[in-house]
Curated annotation (Swiss-Prot):
Keywords: ATP synthesis, Cell inner membrane, Cell membrane, CF(0), Hydrogen ion transport, Ion transport, Membrane, Transmembrane, Transmembrane helix, Transport. The lineage of its organism: Bacteria, Pseudomonadati, Pseudomonadota, Gammaproteobacteria, Alteromonadales. One of its GO terms (cellular component) is proton-transporting ATP synthase complex. CDD domains: ATP-synt_Fo_a_6. This is ATP synthase subunit a.
């Protein structure tokens, strides 16, 4: 596949699949494909779960309703086991994070050439379909969690309590305030950074492996046959990866917010 319709080199093929559709320049560059797919999948999640909730009955539930109930019960039990405060927002937030990130990750299951090829026919030169392979998306999600951590830390502990937590832990002595502040600030800032980079790194690496396997199809018969086996094996393994990454992001969010609700 090529934006010019000519044969691509392996390097240009990889680069093409890793390039976003953008508008703007410099700091104000917008990755349109990441925004469209992330917002679109978020709206699809809301519509599907709203529909399941609206059609819920006391009788025998349908297959989709059973599936939704299993997910909701799984997330709810995870919140009850991990979150030690009282906040009705946490369970819906955890459900949204888990399902939304899973749906964005699941886009990696679509063969790498399908949607970009269709976009090329429509005159769109680049199209990245997996939003979580865009570090801007993963950092946006992590930043949202970070804002909630700060908000609930101040709401539960008060401004003075939050400042005291930063300055008198882990060493409870006024002389250690600079050291405590440095350690606690690094720990606090590391939370969203680790959330974002873990999700981005795993999904970006997974997408790159799919692209490398796809290159084998154009080599020769032997490599093409090997590519089929490798793609099937990686596809099965990657289902575990995308689910696990959504679960880890959700669980760490619950843990961080539970820590924010702890009043020392």
């Amino acid at each position: 596949m090529s934006a010019t319709g000519e044969e691509m080199t392996q390097q240009s093929y990889i680069q093409h699949h890793l390039t976003n559709l953008t508008v703007g320049e410099g700091f104000w560059t917008w990755n349109i494909d990441s925004l469209l797919f992330s917002v679109g999948l978020g709206m699809l999640f809301l519509w599907l779960f709203y529909r399941a909730g609206k059609k819920a009955t006391t009788g025998v539930p349908g297959k989709f309703q059973c599936f939704v109930e299993i997910i909701v019960e799984f997330v709810d039990s995870s919140v009850k086991e991990t979150f030690h405060g009282r906040n009705p927002v946490i369970a819906p937030l955890a459900l949204t994070i888990f399902v939304w990130i899973f749906m964005m990750n699941f886009m990696d299951m679509i063969p790498v050439d399908w949607l970009p090829s269709l976009a090329l026919l429509a005159g769109v030169p680049y199209l990245k379909v997996v939003p979580t392979t865009d570090v801007n998306i993963t950092f946006s999600l992590a930043l949202g969690v970070f804002v909630l951590i700060i908000y609930y830390s101040i709401k539960v502990k008060g401004v003075s309590g939050f400042v005291k937590e930063l300055t008198f832990q882990p060493f409870n002595h006024w002389a250690m305030i600079p050291v405590n502040l440095l350690l606690e600030t690094v720990t606090l800032v590391a939370k969203p950074i680790s959330l974002a980079l873990r999700l981005f790194g795993n999904l970006y690496a997974g997408e790159l492996i799919f692209i490398l396997i796809a290159l084998m199809y154009g080599s020769n018969v032997a490599l093409s046959a090997l590519g089929v086996g490798l793609q099937l094996g990686w596809l099965i393994f990657h289902i575990l990866v995308i689910t696990l990454q959504a679960f880890i992001f959700m669980m760490l969010t619950i843990v961080y917010l539970s820590m924010a609700h702890e009043d020392h």
